[in-house]
């Protein structure tokens, strides 16, 4: 699956980058890491602003497309080990992005521990994920796929991040 085939998703990615870069004053001294970065569809918008990026993408064929498009990409599944490797390579992040990745994670605690390791003390993480309550309330069962390990409520996600020493400060629907 290549995210860049969806015009509406590309527009969403551009709007997100414009908002987050302006709101948190990201610049050429910032470092942005996207987990499950796909073909670089989102990170290319940071690159256009001169902001250093790194994608972490487990699918080698998809990561190769990102690399061909000039997006610095590491082929790996993200978790504590990958985060330690990246910090050893001087890739502590001002911003970590995870869009629609939580459902694919087999060990949520290892994943969130990795986020905490990779994040600079003053950095922030943004996560987009399907909300379990909306899935049930609006009968969105067509969003359930066999490759998803879990679907989370907002409360469950908040508790996991809190347990790993991170504080939630903004939510959008």
Residues of each region from the PLM?
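Extended interfacial segments that mediate partner engagement and assembly in macromolecular machines
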Residues: 1-61, 65, 145
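Glycine-rich phosphate-binding loop signature in dinucleotide/nucleotide-binding domains
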Residues: 26-27, 87-91
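Conserved SAM-binding strand-loop segment of SAM-dependent methyltransferases
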Residues: 70-85
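A conserved beta-strand element that flanks and buttresses the S-adenosyl-L-methionine
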Residues: 94-97
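Short catalytic micro-motifs in class I SAM-dependent methyltransferases
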Residues: 99-101
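A short glycine-rich, Lys/Arg-flanked "PGG" loop and its adjoining helix->strand segment in the class I
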Residues: 109-124
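Short, glycine-/aromatic-enriched active-site segment of Class I SAM-dependent methyltransferases
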Residues: 127-150, 154-156
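Conserved S-adenosyl-L-methionine
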Residues: 166-173
């Amino acid at each position: 699956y290549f995210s860049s085939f969806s015009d509406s998703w590309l527009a969403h990615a551009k709007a997100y980058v414009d908002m987050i870069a302006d709101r948190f004053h990201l610049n050429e001294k910032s470092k942005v890491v996207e987990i499950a970065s796909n073909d670089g569809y989102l990170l290319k918008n940071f690159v256009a602003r001169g902001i250093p990026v790194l994608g972490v993408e487990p699918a080698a064929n998809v990561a190769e497309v990102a690399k061909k498009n000039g997006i610095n990409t590491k082929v790996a599944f993200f978790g504590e080990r990958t985060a330690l490797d990246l910090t050893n390579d001087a890739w502590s992040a001002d911003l970590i992005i995870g869009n629609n990745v939580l459902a694919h994670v087999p060990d949520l605690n290892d994943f969130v521990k990795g986020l905490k390791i990779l994040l600079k003390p003053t950095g922030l993480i943004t996560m987009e994920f399907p909300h379990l309550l909306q899935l049930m309330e609006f009968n969105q069962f067509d969003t359930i796929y066999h490759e998803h390990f879990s679907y989370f409520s907002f409360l469950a996600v908040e508790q996991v991040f809190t347990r790993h020493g991170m504080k939630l400060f903004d939510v959008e629907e």
